[in-house]
Amino acid sequence: MATSSAASVDMEDIQTVDLMSELLRRMKCASKPDKRLVFIGPPGSGKGTQSPVIKDEFCLCHLSTGDMLRAAVAAKTPLGVKAKEAMDKGELVSDDLVVGIMDEAMNRPKCQKGFILDGFPRTVTQAEKLDEMLNRRGAQIDKVLNFAIDDSVLEERITGRWIHPSSGRSYHTKFAPPKVPGVDDLTGEPLIQRKDDNADVLRSRLDAFHKQTQPVIDYYAKKENLVNIPAEKAPEEVTKVVKKVVST
């Protein structure tokens, strides 16, 4: 009885509008098919732009390894405690621990209809361990979306970015220039470039990405669930392609 009472009190503390919104969301999602997706792509390829759109459209949860690790550590779950011990020693969290934490995260109600994995797997070993875990759940990855884009296009996209530091407003010298070069439109304050938004840093990051990720792309290509997304297109065009791919 105590457990029931505690649960009742918790529910009573939730605003009616929040309860209704969640009930409506779950009713809308009930008829959606399950989808288990992996998004792969280099920095600047648009994965981060597309993930929330697809998450909401198909009632999926977005699983980021960094967010999951932080949540498990904060909640002091058994796996979170082990992960914290490794991090405190300056060690990398093992693939088995990461996949275990991911397995726990997939039990949440918001992951009922499936998930988008972003930033994982990064290696073939991780991909294999992910498959093993999903097999134990009687599931598998449905689609792997590779946001394919030429490095030269990425360089133009990223090195042209300028930021207004206090507001976060972003500009681009070619695609979305400020009214006055180097100056924020609203405040007249100077714009800055992030340290990582330069050609040398980008080339280094892209080189590391290609070396690390190409074997993963090949792994999924052999499983015939890999789809290349033309990520050089405008975001709204990419969204149309991604929705079509995920829907089929």
From Swiss-Prot:
State where the protein is found. Cytoplasm
> CDD domains per the record?
ADK
Q: Which domain of life is it from?
A: Eukaryota
Q: Which Pfam families match?
A: ADK, ADK_lid
Whether Manganese counts among this entry's keywords is no
PROSITE patterns the UniProt entry points to:
ADENYLATE_KINASE
What keywords are annotated for this sequence in UniProt?
Acetylation, ATP-binding, Cytoplasm, Kinase, Nucleotide-binding, Transferase
Q: Which residues carry this modification: N-acetylalanine?
A: A2
Q: Does the keyword Phosphoprotein apply?
A: no
List the residue ranges of the region (NMP).
Answer: 64-93
Q: What is its main location?
A: cytoplasm
Q: Which Gene Ontology cellular-component terms appear in the entry? A: mitochondrion; plant-type vacuole; plastid
Describe its function: Catalyzes the reversible transfer of the terminal phosphate group between ATP and AMP. Plays an important role in cellular energy homeostasis and in adenine nucleotide metabolism.
Write out the similarity annotation: Belongs to the adenylate kinase family.
Protein name in UniProt: Adenylate kinase 3
